Amino acid sequence: MKKIIICILTAGFITNCAVENPENINTDITQTYFTEFMACKAGPDQSTATMTSMIGEWQQLLEGDSLVGSWGYAPAVATNSSEDTIWWELQWTSQDDANIAWEAWLQNEDAAAWEEKYTSVLDCDGENRQSFDTAYPMASNAFGELPDSGYFYAEILFCTYENGGTKEDALGFLAGFNNAVNKGGYEGTSYHYGNYFQQGNEDGFLWGNFTNSKESMDKATD
């Protein structure tokens, strides 16, 4: 891996799951899924109570089953490269389905009212959301279930290709990495990971590590 990919830690986050449908059981660990990220800023009225209310009302507005999962990433340390940006991740059944869902959202008067109501809680840049093809090579419960609260810990690394490395090389690395992790004593950490390949970026990709706590992350990445 070091010959073709160099990874640098860019951010640590406390993560919360807002919506998650049953996990995909496809056994092809190199298969990718369409994912979007929106950059968000906390408003003056943000609190646990207002965020809970905001997410609850948002879930009531969702239509169909094209949204597979949604996660929010809040900075856990002051040294994050993204500073105070909160990231909202959306995983879809396909890019076409995502586009259809967004078009319906933009025409939904109740959705517009929801955005206006909660703009002082969380302001997200949906217009400039970023598109990724994402591989999830390991089940989220491979090394223990995540907390019932829905919160877990994430570290995001930016990986650059070296010596002519490509996305295909990165995907080809996954099977060997899984084998190493399975022998690494990760039990009880809830460790799993994802590789996020931004559309139009041929220089590298994001590697996300996920665990049930900061202590588990330290154990898994030691």
Where are these regions (language model features)?
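Short S/T/G/P-rich N-terminal loop/turn motif that feeds into the first structured element of a domain
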Residues: 17-87, 91-222
